[in-house]
């Protein structure tokens, strides 16, 4: 069994791979972590991001809604990522519905939500 620190390092590697364009390897690591810890939200959100970066917004939405938010509806990180997904997919109404409540808070999530809303509202 892997320790929490080892799992965290694996997710760091997967996230770096995903952001570097190596989506296939990133997904393999996410799958490995999920095999050890089914339903583990950080791995599921990484997996969703691996779909967002290749414009597979429908699968990212499915993962976030059906696997993360179904288990933890108040997870603000997952909701923020869903808002990003909707923004990039140009689904303005859905993005605003998700991001508006998040933008009223404080901290990095609120700043990201506010920035995404500003971007949405500047587009025709």
Residue ranges and their predicted role:
Residues 4-29:
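Alpha-helical segment of the N-proximal tetratricopeptide repeat
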Residues 6, 40, 75, 109-110:
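Residue-level recognition of tetratricopeptide repeat
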């Amino acid at each position: 069994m892997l320790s929490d620190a080892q799992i965290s390092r694996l997710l760091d590697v997967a996230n770096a791979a995903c952001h570097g364009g190596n989506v296939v390897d990133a997904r393999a690591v996410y799958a490995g972590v999920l095999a050890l810890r089914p339903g583990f939200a950080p791995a599921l959100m990484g997996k969703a991001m691996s779909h967002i970066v290749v414009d597979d917004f429908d699968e990212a939405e499915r993962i976030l809604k059906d696997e993360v938010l179904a288990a933890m509806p108040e997870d603000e990180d997952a909701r923020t990522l869903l808002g990003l997904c909707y923004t990039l997919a140009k689904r303005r109404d859905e993005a605003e519905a998700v991001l508006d409540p998040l933008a009223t808070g404080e901290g990095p999530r609120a700043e990201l939500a506010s920035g995404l809303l500003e971007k949405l509202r500047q587009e025709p």
